[in-house]
Amino acid sequence: MTMPPLTLYLAAPRGFCAGVDRAIKIVEMALEKWGAPVYVRHEIVHNKFVVDRLRDMGAVFVEELDEAPTDRPVIFSAHGVPKAIPAEAERRNMVYVDATCPLVSKVHLEAERHHENGLQMIMIGHAGHPETVGTMGQLPEGEVLLVETVEDVAGLEVRDPERLAYITQTTLSIDDTAAIVAALRERFPAIAIPRKEDICYATTNRQGAVKAIAGRIDALLVIGAPNSSNSKRLVEVGRAAGCRVAQLVQRATDIDWEALQGATAVGVAAGASAPEVLVDEVIAAFRARFDTTVEAVETVKERVEFKVPRILREPAETP
């Protein structure tokens, strides 16, 4: 039987960023150093495939610190945690490893610096997302105001419009954030801006890669988890760039083939916590149904690497 022809455009960069790669290594190295179980507060990264693999290796995922026993190591997820969490771990004499992405930690330090200078913070982010919760939790209650949309800016009640600074979640839509920043600067001309863009290089690059293929494709598949902020933003970027069909899928089994009927060119992108093995799985699913040509479209090369914490590079103490 002759299969219909189809071109798959693979957006690059895609998949693991340096922060995700580091966080996964931290769990693997902790298991190697201390043995199982090692506890992880919240999913280390937002990807079921990754979490399930680490669980099989002996990681135990919990949502709150008090679910972890005091005599086993605990790891904080890549998204970051409020200051109260490591303080509580220290109070309980727990061994803990902070897997917060260094680019998220940079935003935390920025917030603290502005706070020390007497500025009230405005955070652009998604309510309830672990990264937003962690960043807002670096400062005392009420010191960080959250905005999610341009409309939110008009309703902000600030202490002093002359003493403000803004920070952002690292995984936002670049275009949406630019609109919110413009609204903030219009309403509060004196607002202090970040020294360097808070939205991370990987988020920026993956959104740019989707825009680069959008004009060539009939549909877009983004491989990522439904609770992954950066993956959901890729779907939105694709739609905004004119992709009539844009699906978020965790695995090849999630693909809505009916929605792809008549498509001859499909784009494939992957969120920052999606492993390349899932991309390969999607390509194989297309090859089973179409005479598939695969074309990689790379917009930039990524060479960022982050070191794991010193505690994991030191040998385990012998009793």
From Swiss-Prot:
UniProt-annotated binding residues for [4Fe-4S] cluster: 17, 101, 200
Keywords noted in UniProt: 4Fe-4S, Iron, Iron-sulfur, Isoprene biosynthesis, Metal-binding, Oxidoreductase
Cofactors: [4Fe-4S] cluster
Binding residues annotated for (2E)-4-hydroxy-3-methylbut-2-enyl diphosphate, in chain numbering: 46, 79, 129, 170, 228-230, 273
CDD domains attached to this UniProt entry: lytB_ispH
Record text on cofactor binding: Binds 1 [4Fe-4S] cluster per subunit.
Record GO biological process: dimethylallyl diphosphate biosynthetic process; isopentenyl diphosphate biosynthetic process, methylerythritol 4-phosphate pathway; terpenoid biosynthetic process
Xref: Pfam families: LYTB (PF02401)
Recorded GO MF terms: 4 iron, 4 sulfur cluster binding; 4-hydroxy-3-methylbut-2-enyl diphosphate reductase activity; metal ion binding
Disulfide bonds, paired cysteine numbers: none
Entry EC number(s): 1.17.7.4
Residues at which isopentenyl diphosphate binds: 46, 79, 129, 228-230, 273
Cross-referenced InterPro entries: LytB/IspH
Family: Belongs to the IspH family.
UniProt name for this protein: 4-hydroxy-3-methylbut-2-enyl diphosphate reductase
Organism: Cereibacter sphaeroides (strain ATCC 17023 / DSM 158 / JCM 6121 / CCUG 31486 / LMG 2827 / NBRC 12203 / NCIMB 8253 / ATH 2.4.1.)
